[in-house]
Amino acid sequence: LLIGRNFDFYVGDEFAKNKLVEFIEPENGIPYLSVSWPGMIGVVSGMNKEGITVTINAGKSKIPLTAKTPISFVTREILQYATTIDEAIAIAKKRKVFVSESILVGSANDKNAVIIEVSPDNFGVYRVENSSKVFCTNHFQSEAYKNDKRNQKQIVESHSEYRYEKLQELLQEN
């Protein structure tokens, strides 16, 4: 199982220089590592000792007007407590979030990867059948979001679909 991601969250050169890898040994749960930056609480990319990986990609959201669970806390909880994809899905499903995100979850135990798609009003899981590849950019792919107007707009108006197609092209070449 090979999981890759580009870290294209860019807010200036100084920010780009200050990445760090944290090794966390919590009092409860599974030790994990996280690729982050100083001051960040939670996880945007990481892997736990049981072989669960998480990476997040932002989807199209409306401006949040209420506080709920930050997505980086959800992904941290997945790394700290999940040993399988089903456990990761259960953790994500029990949390209410205030933004839309795709959480790519890989599992050494399951020898598989899925995309958990969360938003304030919906939840979906994208599984690829009969394929060794799953691609995740900045739009949702599960049946739960098939008719979602915000997601359809994201596909048409953003660079997400282009990035998805480019990923397919590059992996086909190599």
Question: Language model features by range: what are they?
Answer:
Residues L2, N6-N174:
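C-terminal, well-structured catalytic/ligand-binding subdomain of enzymes
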